[in-house]
Amino acid sequence: MTTIVSVRRNGKVVMGGDGQVSLGNTVMKGNAKKVRRLYNGQVIAGFAGATADAFTLFERFEAQLQKHSGHLVRAAVELAKEWRTDRSLSRLEAMLAVANKDASLIITGNGDVVEPEDGLIAMGSGGGYAQAAARALLNKTDLSAREITEAALNIAGDICVFTNHNLTIEEQDLAE
């Protein structure tokens, strides 16, 4: 699987992910880009789960962003509805993390759209490790959002066999 982390702090939102793609117990690729920008660079999105499924969801989510003029929450809710009710989409095995200047959200195939109350997202096979690390760093240090994201991903990469240290990090100022 993978690990995706997003942190909001001090006027910035940062999202990062590792680059490992596994097929069963075999590493197939180590430099996949699981975090990318959508909607003219205004939205950061990352995925955990099946790669082909995630690309389908990225396309559908970007279409919803276009349809709803970049309104993140509305686009996420509409994608979740579509994902839950469309037969072909309902079999997809992936989760999306999306963020912009206004919100950070997790979108699941069960139709859930969750905005974490502390602005911290950690998901995927190493998500629990990354969340614990990021939460401790948020509560006990003055590190930047980027530093916390990188540290949490590296800790997850040290522990989770489905997460590596080849990171993709995207950062956005909340004022943009």
Swiss-Prot record:
Residues that, per the record, bind Na(+): G157, C160, T163
Primary localization: cytoplasm
BP GO terms, sorted: proteolysis involved in protein catabolic process
Gene3D superfamilies, sorted: Glutamine Phosphoribosylpyrophosphate, subunit 1, domain 1
A single GO cellular-component term on record: HslUV protease complex
Cited HAMAP family: HslV
Protein name: ATP-dependent protease subunit HslV
Organism field: Pseudomonas entomophila (strain L48)
